[in-house]
Structures are given as C-alpha cells and as structure tokens.
C-alpha cells in the first residue's frame, strides 16, 4: 500500500455535504481534493440513463396496445431488432413506435457507441447517413400533420441525435434554431439541446455552449455532472454578457457551474443577488467550507501536534479570516432567506468556531439543531457543537470534563443507521484527543495527556510507565477517567511487553524475563534462530531454514540470560559472547528477528524506524560490546 494513498474524506473534514446538502444530483459536485468529481465519480452510461422515463412515456402513449414489458424489450433488447423490422402492427401508434425504433436502433452503432477509454488506436468513428436523416424527417413531418404531438417530439429528438452524429455536426445547430420553438419543454427537449451544446463545444464556441449547458443544468438534474464537466470557464465580463438572455434561474445555473471551477464565494454572491432561494448555492457552500476546513484541520493522525491553545487559535483565525474570508457566510446565515437554512446555520456555526467566536457558534448551531429534520442532520450539529466546545477550552477543569462527557461516548460509539448518510467523524476523534492532551500537558498531567492522545516514547520513562500501570489498575476512577481508560489503545499486557523489550535493549535481561512472563506474548515464536550469525546476511533465508529449536520471545530471553551467566563465570566466553552479540544484532532493525520488538506501544511495524527508537533499533551498542568481548577471548 502507498503511504500517500486515499485516507478517507474524514481525515481532515468534519463537515459532511452528504448530510447537509439534500439533493443527490449535487453529490458528484462535492469537493474532492484528489479528483475532478467527488469520489472519482465517472460520467458513465448509468448517469445518463433515461430508460425508466422513456419506458413510462411510451407506455402512456401506447396504452393497452403494447404492454410495458414489451415496450422495454423493443427499446433495449439486442434480440428485438429483427422482430422490429419484420412486424406489421395494425395499431397506428404501434406502427409509429416501430418506425422510430427501426431508425434509432439501426443507428445505435453510431449514436450509442461505447468504447475503451484506454484504447486510442482501434476506435473507429462512423457517421449517420443522410438517407436515415431523411426518413426521420418524413416521420416527423407526418406526425406534425396528424397532430401527434408525442410522436412528433420523439422524432424531433431522433433528428437532433442523427444530425449531431452526422458528418455535418453543425447542422444540428441550425435545425434546432428552426424547430425548437414548437417543442414542449420536456426533459427530452433539453436532451436535444444538449446535442446543440455539444456541436458548439466541438467548434470551441463556449460563449454559445455555456448558456445552453446552464439551461440543461437548471432543468435536468441527472445531467448536472455531465454539463458541469462540459462547461468551460470564461471571464466574469463574458459571463455577464452571456447571462443577459437567460432567466434568473438559468443565470444562477451558469454561475453555479462557473463557481465549480473558479471562486465558490463569488459565484454564491452572484446567485444570491439573483435569487436568494436558489438551491445551487448549497453544493458551492459545501465546497467552500470543505476547502476551508482542509486548510484548518492539519492535526489529523499523520498531521501536526497541537502545541498550544494560543497557537491553534491563531492558525484557525488566520485561515477563516484571511485565506478563506467568512464574514459573508455569517451575514447570509443571519439575514438571507435561503433555500437550505439548515446548511447555512451549520456552516456559520462551524466557521465561527474557527474564528474563535465560540458563543456565536453556539447560537448558529442551536438554530441548526431546531431545523434538522432527520437523525443525520441532528448528528452533524452535535458533532460540530462538540468540536466547538473542545476548541473553546483554555484549560481543562472537572466542570469541562463533565460537560464533554455528555457527548464524547456518543461520538466514539457513533455508527450511522442503515440507510443514513455517515458523518465525517474520523478527524474529530483525533482532534479532540490531541486538544485535550495538549491541555493536560499544560496542567502537568502526563497520564491524562497520554490517555487522551498517545505518543511514542511515553513508556521510555520508567516513572511514567509505573504511574500509568498504577492508574490503569486503580478501582476508584472518576467517570471521565473510566471513559478514557476504556478507550485507551494499550493494555497492561502491552505495557509489560514493551517494558520487557526496552529492558532487553539495555541488557537488563533478568528484568526483561520477569516482565515478559506477565504477557501472553511470551509464547510468540520468533521466525528465525536469533543466535545465528552468518556471513550471508539474509533475513528471509534465515526464516526459510528448518528450525531445530523454536525460540519464543521468553525462551529467547532466557537463553540470552543463560549465556551471559556463563560469560560471567568464564565458561566458554568466546562462543557465548559471540552468540549474545548475534542475538542483539538479530533483534535490531537489521536482523532476522525484528519480530521480537513488534509491540503496539513500540509500534515499529514498517520499513522505517521512528526517531524515538533509533537509539535501540538502529544502535549496535550491545552487539558491539559482546563481539568485542568475544574478540578478547
């Protein structure tokens, strides 16, 4: 696995657009720092699937003349084409249905082709023929004469598609201009308009394509991701000119797509000036807040430590007032009648907390809680409220502990109910731990600092280790202490084993044996003979060798003790010292039994060694001591 891989949206986020923004059509447009669309969401056939609405529309048109299952079969089944051409139905509407299908399905190899996006060589481009377009035009004109509005509209759409995929793609533009006034404003109309936008895009005439895409964005939610992808950003001056011929809602859509690529803030302000009730600001606001928090929330699992209350607040204030101004969010939340007031109240509460305006944050979040109309929205408010309370703490007191204890167990145990959008809670868990740990360090309380957020090296100090052992075993813990002791990631067994390992590297073997006997890990078998010392230094080779003697962590320590006792008595000091030297070498990072130091507290499982353990895992002090002793004999 790559260490720079995807770590989840909650790695540095607590603001969930999945919860705060209601409409699903905006989901691909949520903020994603790694991909153009949220979740690397491809624009695939499914996102452009109108099959259900098409089947329903034809069913309503054909009535009892053709069952819905048959309609579906003729529209989409590969085996139906031959039957379509051979059928001679008596019903006029069914005849027209088959006539349309004969043209539409005969040309699917051109108009509905799928291809391998990685295959640049074998893709062939074919064009629809004029004869097919003429047949479709005849059917369209016949339907107009008969005043069959449904069929005429369907044939009009087929003509738009055939012209777009012809060698004269631009012909679809003129045809649309000549015929669009007579078309009802259905989804099919906007799907036809989409071909016109595509023709303009092919000409790189974005001043013409963008307004059309805005109309489609406004009317066909399922195409919002597609048209946003096809949109090309232009200057503000150009956009103002283009928007003149659009309705206020369409102008809002134009600015929404532009805000996706440029400034969400500017786009939101333009949209609100046109229509304060426009829903298009929702996904833009969520993107702005997600961008802001990504710069604020740098204290995740692999992020920065929180050095002090003051430093944290200086950082958040700078981001929320300079890098990402937020006055406009607060003003809008207070004064504007927006489409999604819940979203604005949550956003205002969240950014107020970053501005160190904690009481204002409480006010906004209290309003949001009253507006929350489902459990997920209520949980979102509760999460951000908890973050606000933690960020507001200048010092930790029993009163603060009691207040936080109302919500912390809920957050640690939180699981979204089935069918409910999940909160982004991962960062919150880490941030709360780091914040409380920082405050406890300031109070000179190393035990609670370690319990709330563990750091490597804590157990290198004997007095801290002893204090933690005593704390974990005490019976009269407060409810606050009990909560953190249960959540603490290490057990007494982990502590005993880590102490045994640390004692070994200090050559305190008797103590190491006594400690190892307290832990179940005493029986863990080492992957190689730790006393081998071959010129060919190959750990994998050592692991593959048959083992005449299988050493556990405990029996390994006991054997080292036996050899050291022999050295002290002068019993074969050369061989015993050489073997003990091998033991210390093989138990280092470079040796064949690195397994010996695997322990949750020491936490050195990878190919790197953290600085806290360089002195024992990379240091040859003990090995060198015994090799030199062997050399003397």
Where are these regions (language model features)?
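Extracytoplasmic/secretory-pathway proteins
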Residues: 1-144, 149-161, 166-633
